[in-house]
Amino acid sequence: MFEIKNMLMTLAAAAIFCGCAAPQVQVQQRRRPVVPPPPPVTAVKIAEKITPDGKLDEKVWQKAPVYELKLVDSYRYYPPMEYARIRKDPYESARFRMVYDENYLYLGVEVDDSDVVCFEKKDQGDFYRNSDLLELFLWPEELSCYWELYATPSGLKTSIFYPAGGLSMIQYRDRSPLMPGFKVFSTVQGTLNNHSDTDKGWTTEMCVPLKVLAARGVPFKPGTKWRVLVGRYNFSKNLWKMQNSWFPVLPAFNFHYRSYYSPLEFK
């Protein structure tokens, strides 16, 4: 019994020694990028009548400040050689403005795009899977609900209403009806779905009916708190990988981080 006890003590001591002498393996954790507080986005109220046509050539648009989308570094965790190749591609930018009147919020976007594509044929599609796409997210801060709205270069559109971030997105993404009165008008500076030429880009106007937003309990007007995000999917035969961009910049690639959306200022 004494010999067995001594043997067990010897084994325990050896295990402790080995554990102390073994190299310490450190798990490399991904650092969360530090982003500044989101800058505000100003929506300018207009008295003039707007005729949406996807051209943005009306003088009323000049009243609104311009915001440029920033490239999303969504591939930074790719293998080094692949990531280096992706970063060689030029960034194709986009710029947006926001105005509103008594009936609609208007989002106007000018998009740089050397290969404009949209392969879907009807509204309420998952355009982010294969088509160039602009997305607008609208969130009334007092509520849990928010909207995700799509505009494509062909004028097709999608609207999704999420009652709350704590619910599964899948059922609402698949079953949401098109928002009544929601309109999209686009023009292409080039040719759609033609990889053999070089396009200049596309322009889009999104018209969001304010009465639909207000029906949830928060009117879209000065004195209320709204937050916004504008995002983009850029598919192209000229790019190594699809490009994403956004405004404002979020700490990670997820368009649904509402706490980081830009506060909306009414002017």
Please identify what each model-predicted range represents.
Residues 1-11:
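Bacterial N-terminal signal peptides that target proteins for export
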Residues 3, 19-22:
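Secreted/luminal cysteine- and crosslink-motif detector
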Residues 9-19:
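Bacterial N-terminal signal peptides
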Residues 21-267:
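Structural preference for beta-rich elements and adjacent junctions enriched in aromatics
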